[in-house]
Design a protein with these regions (language model features):
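Acetyl-CoA-dependent GNAT
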Residues: 7-79, 90-92, 96, 100, ...
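Short hydrophobic/aromatic beta-strand or adjacent loop that forms the aromatic wall/cage
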Residues: 43, 139-143, 356-357
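Conserved glycine-rich acetyl-CoA-binding loop
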Residues: 53, 73-91, 98-100, 104, ...
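Short glycine/serine/proline-enriched coil/turn segments at secondary-structure junctions
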Residues: 65-66, 134-136, 298-301
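Conserved catalytic-core motifs of GNAT/GCN5-like acyltransferases
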Residues: 108-109, 121, 126-143
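Active-site-adjacent structural segments surrounding the nucleophilic cysteine of cysteine proteases
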Residues: 148-248, 256, 272-273, 315, ...
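Active-site-adjacent substructure of cysteine-protease-like catalytic cores
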Residues: 239, 244, 248-321
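Noncatalytic regulatory segments and standalone regulatory/sensor domains
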Residues: 284, 288, 294-296, 300-306, ...
Length: 368
């Protein structure tokens, strides 16, 4: 039976320092730093005991307003090895990060530490980068990460479809919803670009534009879905980063066209912010939600990004993120059925200086 961990306390300092000195040759955590981590609100330092004595620890760091947590350090006293304590500590660290609202745990490990690397790979971590000359002795660090899903397996019958272009997250989300509600729906890259052409804002930064909520709503209705739009701002969207007057004018004209077509349709638009109940009630009635987020907390870049909300565990929303970063060996399994805590997701679901919130609530049947 797994041994539970507990928060470290001041009386553990001698043992923690001893473990550190025995487990690592360089880059050791000092007594002073251990004490500081115990008091830091954005850190979780837990120990595991064997026969009444501290046998190991993990240290997880949380970054505010981020979906990521970092396993800063993990160690087992050499005299206590061989009892599976490393695995228990790793699993406890993952659970702590997940319960802290994070759904990705990252770590660094020395490239010359095959035992630790094997442990991480065994438990589903994937290598996604390298830090050169990272440690005090100039050894490189390998970077690993794992998507956290908590204790319960999240099952979904909503198909997953990765976007094929950088600017087609919105169409990919809509196609997933269409494939869920319409089993005979044919989805492919041609349809993806067709939806993008119908709903694009024309420009975004220096490249092709992403898709706006009104254009996507019209595309959804055209394909037989019933949709309701929640939008926190009236008027043109996504203009904060557009410096060219010519581009701004074209974007404003395109969005004026969307608004005029929405006004002559029967698509309801409510100009207010999305809230928790909007999503939970939609999901409870069998609907899905396309939600605009800032990609910064997930992808590290400040761009608008559409995701599809497909489920609710009671504490977490479950999403399909259409972006798969193949350059770092991601697969669709890494990006589908992601559980994100309610509070973290609502924090992510806004973009830009004005805090734009946009959401499409989509259903197979007419809305009540």
């Amino acid at each position: 039976m797994p041994t539970p961990t507990r928060p470290a306390r001041a009386s553990d300092l001698d043992r923690l320092v001893a473990i550190e000195e025995l487990a690592f040759q360089t880059d050791r955590i000092s007594r002073r730093s251990f004490r500081a981590f115990m008091e830091r609100k954005t850190a979780m330092l837990h120990v595991i005991e064997q026969e009444g004595e501290v046998a190991g620890y993990f240290l997880v760091l949380f970054r505010r307003n981020s979906a990521l947590a970092r396993l800063y350090s993990i160690a087992v006293h050499p005299g206590c090895s061989g009892h599976g304590l490393g695995t228990q500590l790793l699993q406890a660290a993952e659970q702590a990060a997940f319960e802290g609202g994070r759904f990705v745990l990252r770590l660094e490990v020395r490239e010359d530490n095959p035992g630790a690397i094997a442990l991480y790979r065994k438990h589903g971590y994937r290598e996604w980068g390298r830090y050169l000359d990272y440690y005090e002795d100039h050894t490189d660090a390998l970077r690993f990460e794992k998507v956290l899903r908590g204790d319960a397996e999240v099952e979904s019958n909503v198909p997953y479809f990765p976007q094929s272009q950088e600017f087609t997250c919105g169409p990919a989300c809509l196609m997933m919803a269409l494939a869920h509600f319409q089993p005979n729906y044919r989805w492919d890259a041609v349809e993806e670009i067709r939806i993008w052409r119908e709903s694009t804002t024309i420009f975004m930064l220096s490249g092709p534009g992403g898709c706006g909520p009104l254009g996507l709503a019209l595309a959804a209705q055209r394909r037989g879905l019933h949709v309701k739009v929640l939008l926190s701002h009236e008027g043109p969207l996504f203009l904060d980063s557009v410096r060219s007057p010519a581009k701004r004018e074209v974007m404003e004209l395109a969005q004026t066209d969307f608004r005029q077509r929405i006004e002559t349709s029967d698509i309801p638009v409510e100009y207010r912010s999305l809230d928790l109940n909007d999503l939970r009630e939609t999901l409870a009635r069998g609907g899905l939600a396309l939600v605009l987020i800032s990609a910064f907390q997930m992808l590290g870049v400040k761009v608008p990004h559409w995701v599809l909300v497909i489920g609710d565990t009671g504490t977490h929303f479950v999403i399909h993120d259409p972006f798969v970063d193949y350059e770092v060996s991601e697969t669709p399994a890494d990006c589908s059925s992601l559980p994100i805590s309610h509070s973290l997701f609502l924090g992510m679901a806004q973009f830009g200086k004005q805090g734009l919130r946009a959401c499409l609530l989509v259903h197979e049947e007419p809305l009540p």
